[in-house]
């Protein structure tokens, strides 16, 4: 891929240190006010229970999918896989590319876990340099806590997914 660690592309202009430091300061907190739990939560719980009973003792992994390139550095609007939306209740506007829903086996059936790419931090340059996830490029994403409140699922960062899957 043509992206660096901070999400910038090889043809993006250099990021002077002064600009990077300036862009990290002075941002007001912008929590989402009045998050209402999704009306889909009761339906999702039933769907998860049925899926859990179908695969006892097995780990179930349902990816949301990724972005599809339209032309060069332009992507089509993201649409999560239908199975991901069905089992999480996450609607189009809240779906984040590369998210993964997992049913992890436990003594009670399964634990439902959602791995997402959370809102960009102001401690890095990602929020204004990363064309794939940066808030200036694609808009505000929900934090882990906001997603958990709205959809009633345990939420973790997608960056932790590989480590989670390797700890069988």
Please report, for each region that a protein language model flagged, where it lies by residue.
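A composition/biophysics-driven feature that prefers long, compositionally simple stretches
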Residues: 1-168
């Amino acid at each position: 891929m043509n992206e660096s660690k901070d999400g910038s592309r090889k043809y993006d202009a250099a990021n002077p240190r002064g600009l990077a430091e300036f862009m990290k300061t002075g941002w007001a907190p912008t929590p989402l006010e009045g998050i209402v739990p999704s009306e889909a939560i009761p339906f999702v719980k039933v769907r998860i229970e049925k899926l859990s009973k179908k695969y006892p003792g097995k780990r179930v992994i349902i990816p949301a999918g990724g972005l599809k390139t339209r032309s060069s550095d332009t992507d089509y609007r993201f649409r999560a896989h239908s199975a991901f939306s069905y089992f999480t209740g996450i609607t189009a506007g809240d779906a984040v590319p590369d998210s993964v829903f997992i049913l992890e086996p436990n003594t009670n059936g399964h634990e439902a876990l959602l791995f997402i790419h959370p809102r960009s931090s102001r401690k890095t340059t990602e929020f204004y340099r990363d064309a794939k996830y940066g808030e200036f490029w694609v808009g505000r994403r929900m934090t882990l806590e906001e997603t958990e409140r709205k959809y009633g699922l345990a939420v973790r960062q997608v960056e932790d997914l590989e480590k989670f899957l390797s700890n069988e």
